[in-house]
Amino acid sequence: CITEEKKKLITFKWIISVGLFVQPCDIDNILEIANANKLWVLDDAAQSFGSSYKNKISGNLCDISATSFFPAKPLGCYGDGGAFFTNNENYYKIAYSAHLHGMGSNKYEYDRIGMNGRIDTIQAAILIEKLKIFKSELIKRSELAEYYKRQFLDLGTNIKLPKVISGATS
């Protein structure tokens, strides 16, 4: 439990929006809150990859987005991995450096703490092939979701089913 005194000491810098079930967040409302409070937004598109919001593809809804290639995600490979998306050159340079152990502009100088963030070649090969069928997989998922929705509705139960938010595709 955070006391009122401790709340006054907390400084927020980020909002992390998380899309779920191949559905993006209502990013307009999130960006409005972020802009009003001078906060950055990181869109976690790991579960929403392949969806769209107001004709913008998930992974491209704000300045910084990320996705995961974990097998259970919409665009999964057979191991771990992920991707970072940005149109901001400064964010790109920081992320690029961080994924190469923090390497700076000189090969043997390190500007920050980093890690090895490169995906291995086997996972990359799997993703290249999966990208070729990704759209058809999304269509099949939507068809199956609609089928299950009809089946649950036909049961006449009080089960609450997920709805796609206004302006979004799933």
Q: What do the predicted segments below correspond to?
A:
Residues 16, 43-76, 106-111:
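Conserved active-site segment immediately N-terminal to the catalytic lysine
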Residues 22-25, 41, 77:
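Hydrophobic/aromatic residue at the end of a short beta strand that borders the catalytic acidic motif
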Residues 41-43, 86:
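Hydrophobic residues in well-ordered beta-strands that form the structural core
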